[in-house]
Amino acid sequence: MEANWTAFLFQAHEASHHQQQAAQNSLLPLLSSAVEPPDQKPLLPIPITQKPQGAPETLKDAIGIKKEKPKTSFVCTYCSKAFRDSYHLRRHESCHTGIKLVSRPKKTPTTVVPLISTIAGDSSRTSLVSTIAGILSTVTTSSSGTNPSSSASTTAMPVTQSVKKPSKPVKKNHACEMCGKAFRDVYHLNRHKLSHSDEKPFECPICNQRFKRKDRMTYHVRSHEGGITKPYTCSVCGKGFSRPDHLSCHVKHVHSTERPFKCQTCTAAFATKDRLRTHMVRHEGKVSCNICGKLLSAAYITSHLKTHGQSQSINCNTCKQGISKTCMSEETSNQKQQQQQQQQQQQQQQQQQQHVTSWPGKQVETLRLWEEAVKARKKEAANLCQTSTAATTPVTLTTPFSITSSVSSGTMSNPVTVAAAMSMRSPVNVSSAVNITSPMNIGHPVTITSPLSMTSPLTLTTPVNLPTPVTAPVNIAHPVTITSPMNLPTPMTLAAPLNIAMRPVESMPFLPQALPTSPPW
């Protein structure tokens, strides 16, 4: 009777339970050991990566748990330091190569098993079966690309994934005691400290040359192994370099458009500090070229000398040696002192001029200057035309010449050069012979505003040249009386205008000897 009743029940419910039959048969061994009393607490979320106790291998294959790989050491090729994974190795090698990593590869998100509802009474077996069946269907449908929500159990919460946290900035807690520069670890701090000392602990085994850093020694050893290789190639222009730091410097100097180092004096900007220091030399003290006198900075004085056909350096005016920064600073200070002295002298002269132009100092100073000028002109006239002493030395008049009193005759046997204006405002009487045996050059205007009388012979044995018509006009505005013979044996050249007012030509017999036979003249 019981067997027939059981067969009837299974036949009645065969259509409704046909879809869950496969999952129940595979999970019966697990469910037999997982039955709990009614007062059992809710089950906590179980990560998929965690293997349940007593689970068969089919569940492990369905969920897709990966086997742990054996740990392998990742060793740096530059300093032989070992790391636990390839990412940390590549991040460490970027310190040697100078190439920064863009970002760390993303981790695979962790999938969490949803929370299972409270299980109570005899229905615990059915609810547990349906829940685990829903989990299995979720995993299989998500791997095939279908929507997992359609086959998941109604008592299960949505699957959550871990959110990636933003990367924290690297802390640089290791500071140098000498310069204050900070580093992220002790290794880089110790490598930096070598720059403050002369210690070179790494020695080349071939040529015994010593280096401060091991990577520098490694690059040097490569030069002994069949020549210098250039394995580091620029991705932009294809140029090769033997060291990674040389490649990074090349990229910054040539291909980079960033100019973070700016000049405080002008608007120039540069990619590196070295180029900024080279530029700052232009704003320092300058040196004058000993050939052309042009002011140039010490950085460009050598190249400037090549334009004059010289390659040697200019010697310092202080120590007579080649120009250096110390000599430049001393010479710059000397130039500043000279400029300050010149400025003080100019200020004193300006103060004196202001005092002269003020009243009553203006009148006093004007009278003093006028008296000094009169004395100078009288002295020059007395030296030129002395009654008892002949002019035996060349006479050059470089200032305006005025004759304000009577002048007697004399003898001149040396050149007389009039390089400034000569003005006669009083009668000039020549009562004795006047002999001029050397050239007489008049390079400036000669103005005669008073009678000129010559009662004795005037002999000119050398040419009288009036060189230019602009700078040497001869103006005769008063009568000229010549009562004695006038001999002009040599040609008299008039290259400048000759203006004679209030006198007819017939009263001057000497003009036909100097002028052409017919006008214009």
Swiss-Prot record:
- Pfam families xref list: zf-C2H2 (PF00096), zf-C2H2_4 (PF13894)
Q: Whereabouts are the sequence repeats?
A: 394-400, 445-451, 457-463, 479-485
User: Which parts of the sequence are annotated with region: 4 X 7 AA repeats of P-[LV]-T-[IL]-T-[ST]-P?
Assistant: 394-485
The question of whether Acetylation is a record keyword is answered with yes
The condition associated with this protein in its record is: Cardiomyopathy, dilated, 1OO: A disorder characterized by ventricular dilation and impaired systolic function, resulting in congestive heart failure and arrhythmia. Patients are at risk of premature death. CMD1OO inheritance is autosomal dominant.
Q: Which family is it part of?
A: Belongs to the krueppel C2H2-type zinc-finger protein family.
The protein, known as: Vascular endothelial zinc finger 1
Q: Which gene encodes it?
A: VEZF1
